[in-house]
Every structure is written in structure tokens, then in C-alpha cells.
Amino acid sequence: MINNLKRKKAVLELSNGMKFEGKLIGYDAAVSGEMVFNTGMLGYSESMSDPSYIGQILVFSFCLIGNYGVPKLENDNFLTALGHESSSIKTQGIIVSEIFDESYHYGSMIPLEQWMIEQKVPGIAGIDTRYLVQTIRNTRNLFGWIVPEGCKKENTIRKFPFIENFTKDEYVDPSKFNLMPTVSTKERKVFGTGKKKVAVVDCGVKWNILRMLVDRGCQIELVPWDTDFSTVEADGWLISNGPGDPRNTGDLVERVKELLKGDKPVLGICLGHQIISLASGAKIKKMPYGHRSHNQPVFIIPGQKAFMTSQNHSYMVDPATIAKDWSLWFENANDKGVEGIKHKTKPFMSVQFHPEASSGPNDTAWILTEFINKL
């Protein structure tokens, strides 16, 4: 456990005027970001390294974070880097009720706080995170500053990488910007030696998606988000997860429309699901507070078979706008939101949740197998 008596004070300043005082953890610097929360009991290293969280301050509602440290990361090798979804922390900062400053696990590389310091990521402990989660849930578009005692906002070291001019005291909504150039690979890369080749459009892909494709015998070509798809030879396409508003992704939707004119299998995951939905003619709307947890139940349609899923998104498909040649595939059991759509005649499908999990339940990993079987 942390010793609060030896720690600097830090304040979380919210855009609605509220302030929460706690103790600084991690790196000593001020940061700003969109406030989001995750209700998972574990998987903090996967969440913090998930590119979908870029530009956001992540609140963990569970009472104790960090007790198993951070798993080893060997040479940025996604095949062996279990517990990591990219090569670095992507969150602006974190808020926890309590952090464990040691690590008791055979696979641990370093304690969580040491990882944060090395990656220059600050956080605050000692805050009632469940009350903070309620505040975020009840306030649409909430933003915040983590400000350590004696630290000036203009000295922030994790400025938004997608904004050229960032001024102090500014609350920035990252979803207003095209975040693809920040998180996508800059060059095409090939992994695996399988007979079937999948082109993965990197919108901020989680490493476990790549792992599961390779484990299932696929060769994958990871391509930048702005790639001319006509220059890529593949048996099928996967549009990956990623951060931000799917309507602020440049001409990606138009290029995916061209893919949907063909007959090769296409799978979308999370942001990729929203991109495919827009390309098919559906509309997207922002949710009041999003889904970010490991315990989101979904029903497969038709039928009433349920699956537990891992989710991380702020936007959803408007069910009234699903195109006539597409059908509802999955529905959220809690709020009846669209969790997946499927083309009625072509091998196109997309899901709002994460079938690759990491972290979370593996109930829907079969979706990747179904996609591969269509190649």
C-alpha cells in the first residue's frame, strides 16, 4: 500500500468546477485530458497501454490497483508482451482509490508506479473513485487537470500530440481531432507465415488482435490508417479499434466504402465497427458516458444466447439507421444498444466489443475464428 504521509498533494480539477484532493502517484507533472472510467477489477496495464485511451485520464473504480505489478515487455514484441496492448502507456494519467507500490507476481517486471515514472505519466491516489465515476456518468463531456502541489499547468510534459498549440488552463476534447496519425503505424509490417493473409488497418490496434490472428494461422499485414487499399493484396480485411470520434477520421470511411463494394471478408472491431457502420450508411451518436468494463452482457440476434464482453467506447450506432442490407447481430442486454451488425449476403461483420478481450472474458473469441473461416 502507499504511504500517503510521504507523498505530495495533488488536485484533480474538473471542467464542471469540482475539485478532488489526493496524493500524487507516478511522475511529477501536470496533465489534462478527457475524464473516462473503467470498472474492471484487473487489466490495468492493458488498459493504460491501449491506444484507444489516448488523450484521456482514466479513473479505475476498483478499490486497489497495482498489486501484481506490470508484466515484462521484451523488445516491443507483441507476440510475447502479454499484459501490454502497445509499447507504451497511452493514457494521459490515472486516478485510483489506492495503489499498491510493490508487485507480487512471477510475471511482474516492475511496480506500477515505477512504470508510470519511467513513462512520465502522473496520477492521483486517495480519491473516492466510485463517487468520481458517478460524477463522470452524470456529466456529459467532462474533462480534467491533474495538478501536483507546486506544479504549474504550463509545464505539462504530456501535451496532446495531435494539437500543435496547447495553452495552459485549456480543456481539450480529443474527439474533435483526427487521432489516427498519432496512434497508427507509420509503415507497413508483415507478421506470421500463414497461408491466409489478413490486412489489418491500424487505427490504434490492440496487440492481442494481432496475436490472435497469428495464433490462428494467419499472415497479417499491418497497414497505416491512410493506406491506399488498392495497393494491398489480402484475403480479408480487419478494421481495428482506436480512439476518438469515427466521424473525424479523414477519408477512412470513404475508403472502407470501396472495400464494401467487393466480396472479400471484412471485420470491424470497436472503432472499426463504427467505421464500417458509417460506410454502410448508418449514423453514429455519442453515448452519455460510454461502456468501459469487462462485464458488458450482449445477446446474439436472433436468439437469446448471451456473452460477456470487454468494451471501451464512447460512441454507438443509431439502431434506426442500420442499412436494409445489414442486420443487427448483437444487442447490449443492459441498454439495448447496437453491439454488432452483419451483412445479409456478403462476408462483412463488425462488433462494438472486443472479441480479443485482453483484458476481459474470452466468450466471443470465436468471432475471429468465424472471420478467418470465411477467408
Model region roles, listed by residue range:
Residues 122, 197, 265-267, 283, ...:
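Proline-centered loop/turn at the N-terminus of a beta-strand
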Residues 197-202, 309-310, 349-353:
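Active-site-proximal beta-strand elements of phosphoester/diester hydrolases
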Residues 1-224, 246, 260, 358, ...:
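RNA-binding accessory domains that recognize and position tRNA/RNA substrates
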Residues 223-230, 289:
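ATP-dependent adenylate-forming carboxylate-activation enzymes
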Residues 338-375:
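A glycine-centered loop/beta-turn motif at secondary-structure junctions
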Residues 232-237:
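Short acidic/histidine-rich motifs immediately flanking catalytic phosphotransfer sites
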Residues 305-346:
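Catalytic beta-strand/loop cores that center a nucleophilic Ser/Cys/Thr
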Residues 241-319, 360-370:
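Cysteine-nucleophile active-site neighborhood
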